[in-house]
Amino acid sequence: MSFQLVIAEKPSVARSIAAVIGATEKQNGYWQGGGYLVSWCIGHLVSFAEAGQYDEKYCKWKYEDLPILPQPWQFIVPDEKKQQFEIVRSLLNRPDVDSVTAATDAGREGELIFRFVYQMAGCTKPVKRLWVSSMEDAAIREGFANLRPDSDYDALYQSALCRAKADWLVGINATRLFSVLYHKTLTVGRVQTPTLKMLVDRDAKILRFQKEKYYTVGIHSGSLKADSGRIADAETANSIKEKCTGANAVCASIRREKKTEQPHKLYDLTTLQREANRLFGFTAKQTLDYAQQLYEKKLLTYPRTDSQYLTEDMGQTVQHLVSDLLRLLPIAQGLDLPPKVGRVLNSKKVSDHHAIIPTSEFVKQGFTGLAESECKLMSLVCSKLLCAIAAPHEYETVTAVFSCAGNEFTAKGKTVLVPGWKEIDQRFRSTLKADTEEEVLNTLPELAEGQSFSVTANVSEHFTSPPKAYTEDTLLSAMERAGAEDMPEDAERKGLGTPATRAAILEKLVQMGFVQRKGKQLVPTKDGINLAVVLPESLTSPVLTAEWENRLTEIAKGNADPDEFMAEIEAQVRQLVKTYSCISADKQNLFQSERVIIGKCPRCGENVYEGKKNFYCGNRGCQFVMWKNDRFFEQRKKAFTPKIAAALLKNGKAKVKGLYSEKTGKTYDATVLLADTGGKYVNYRVERKE
């Protein structure tokens, strides 16, 4: 009997696929049954080798060894993944396996994950590709009924390979180059660094901002209020107020406009991450993680998408889905919603995957068994679908201009004619615990041109507002639009990163200490600011990186040459190393941490500083050092804090509370004495119990 081997990206996906195709017998590292073997990767089972694997000299970071340009490229299997790789390799090479199905995630990265494993295993058997946008049983069955040759995705693989190689070349070489120059590990990345630069530029604008005071004059008559434009000085504003108080204001003009606001599009990953950050405070990574969990539970369609439309063959499916949601969701009770499904259907605007929507499986299960965060995300996606197929929001605006004492004042009002999709949106937002911006409607009284009023007047003081710090919501939007104004109209990819990678980029910036979260705000640290300032434009420009993304998209479509792209990347890396061969001595200390002075050295009188593991004398010729993990303090289960160290240096002794006694098993308070013998180690002793 021969088998078809199916390789998924992770165990949970393999389990779902196996259940649908009848591979129900659990084996070591795979499922078997119905003529199928179903195994899995654990993310990237195979990766590019580290630089040190090409040559031992690369284990140390030296300028003279740069640039590092692998030829040929080598691959490794990480130690923690070797067991599963060996299982997959043995399955690929089993004599009774006559064909292979690539069932990794349907996208650029998923293609790369499978191809690396397939090549590393030395397999040459024919491969078909499973391409699905949902983990529902019906979608998996349909996918297996429409498997395509994996060669159809060769261009996608070349795009993924170019992306991975470019990231390695720029990341390894630029990180080593600037780390060596500045004597500190400075992580540089193709997308990460321009993103940091955007944060630094915004921070600089905020710091440079100088608020300016201005004034407005308001006139009032009953419920009517109209305002002047901005007035620069208080004297002029008060003069206008005095003239208008008790005077007559005449309605000079009234302009009425009927307007229509179409529903917003369905969610792609970026818009879902932005809205979840705005409404729930989720980070981009949290939203992606929750969406991935819901996808694997078959409740949500594939989340790593950049499309906000559905394919035209999904019309009937969406009709049924909407009807079911209207019955299921509390916010939909009593809604009169004739669905306009055609608005969300456009096959031309769907590339790898359609927009994110709930599945029919979710309609059956509902919110039962979901965590609170998953419930929030599902509610958000459901309400978006209902909004997207609802009627437009129709309203009328009224702009009335008044003349009073030779000055012009304006009043604006808005009246809703047809609530449309906004009724659903407002119902959803009313269920949220978080504060949301509610639209305040200002209805003007009935007015006629030439109508006259006796008015009172007042002066209001205002200040101009600084630019706002980025939140994950606004930064994701800026990343998505980066470079768009400088690129051709028909450029398909105009941004930093992809929907699937942006969350990880933000997390890495935070982990590396270049960015910190302050509430919802993302703010660059001192090191982040310095790094963005010292790096060249070729690494920090969002426009150049957006051009890369567009080229990668063109490669995936077969419209650009991958070899040309890689040649340009290698040339850029060579030029970078050549240009930055040295820096001035004063700049070499730019990233050195400001040392905290603890006290004076009892041996030489120089300053003693706090290090990561010790308190050390700043005089290199002096050997005085107090180790934080000194056995004296560890035996007594007491942290050797800067406060204790400072007291010992100043007074030769420190009062310490909560010392542990091994003899009694209890704690006690005592005075610890510094007993410096002048040798390599410093001693301590307890003077007396108190």
Task: Please report, for each region that a protein language model flagged, where it lies by residue.
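C-terminal or mid-to-C-terminal helical accessory/interaction module adjacent to the motor/catalytic core
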Residues: W73, P95, D137-S221, R256-T260
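Metal- or metallocofactor-binding catalytic centers and their adjacent structured scaffolds
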Residues: A234-Y267, Q273
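Conserved short loop/turn motifs at secondary-structure junctions
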Residues: S2-L5, A103-A106, H183-T185, R256-K265, ...
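Amphipathic alpha-helical transducer elements in NTP-driven molecular machines
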Residues: P11-A18, G35-V38, I42, P78-R89, ...
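Phosphate-rich ligand and nucleic-acid binding surfaces
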Residues: K225, R255-R256, L326
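Basic, low-complexity terminal or inter-domain segments flanking catalytic cores
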Residues: S2-L5, L92, T175, R208, ...
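Intrinsically disordered, low-complexity regulatory segments
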Residues: M1-A164, W168, P466
